[in-house]
Amino acid sequence: KPVTTGSTAPAGVPVAVNPPPSVRPVVPVTMEPAPAKLPPPAPMPSGKRAIVIAIDAGHGGEDPGALGPKGAREKHVTLAIAKELQRQINAERGYRAELVRTGDYFIPLRKRTVIARKKGADLFVSIHADAAPRAAAFGASVYALSDRGATSETARWLADSENQSDLIGGAGNVSLDDKDKMLAGVLLDLSMTASLSSSLNVGQKVLSNMGRITPLHKRRVEQAGFMVLKSPDIPSILVETGFISNPNEAAKLATLSHQQSLARSIQSGIRQFFQQNPPPGTYVAWLRDSGKIAPGPREHVVSSGESLALIAQRYQVGLAVLRSANNLRSDTIKVGQTLNIPTTALAAQP
């Protein structure tokens, strides 16, 4: 569980903030073979940047997070899911995923959002696995920052002289260092309000998609004062992928197939949000403004004589993207098989 600050969310595990220890190898959470690495995302056309998603694998290093009944550690599960989510996001043109931590080491909570900001993140996604005293507790959840947490964070930023030169407003890059205190307060409040609204929006889309592949603990986005969500300029969500304290869910969380399904559902929610709200100057904004984004999710039933490459060409979607969207490890498909066509596919066919 993540550390909370005055939250009514499930109790977190207090963590001492120490300098990061030396990096140690991650202990594998599954014996299944790792998916093949995909090539880096294709470069964007001039003036059409990629949307950047910062993925934060919860806990790490001396902070193991929650423990499963058979010894599974949250820090290993979250890193495995984060890496799979990064792989899937990077398979889609117009998006780039950056990991906040890439190995088994601890990063102080506030530094995680600092790292995301330095990477130019348009969205911050923190991955966790829940725990509860009752082993029967189950289901995935999504959190955004609470209103009370947002108010206290705005006050902290104004009081902290180190933030006076920081930038807010995402791609707008609005500096506070030349603003008087009242104007800085207004700008921060507007930025935090917009960020929170976007967080709730993308959070609900992620939650709805997760509900298709795993039980939900709550069917609405919950709000709490989690430290990693307190960025005034970056929409931020915290995803509880399931209860690692539940024997059944702990076993699923350790499998590659479930990690892939969770990552795919999170990616789908993120994609839906940015297709409706693409940051200006991005490739996705250009697709939308040019009318080249298909109106909604599509399915294709494989018929005799078709290959995956032909289907990808028909819908003008990358072969790697089509494989990722359908969790395919090869290009082998069967007649009658239903394929999901990513919503960013160009509508080449009626």
Predicted segments with their positions:
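Primarily a LysM-type cell-wall glycan-binding module
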Residues: 290-319, 337-338
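Catalytic-core regions of hydrolytic enzymes
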Residues: 6, 15-177, 192-196, 200-202, ...
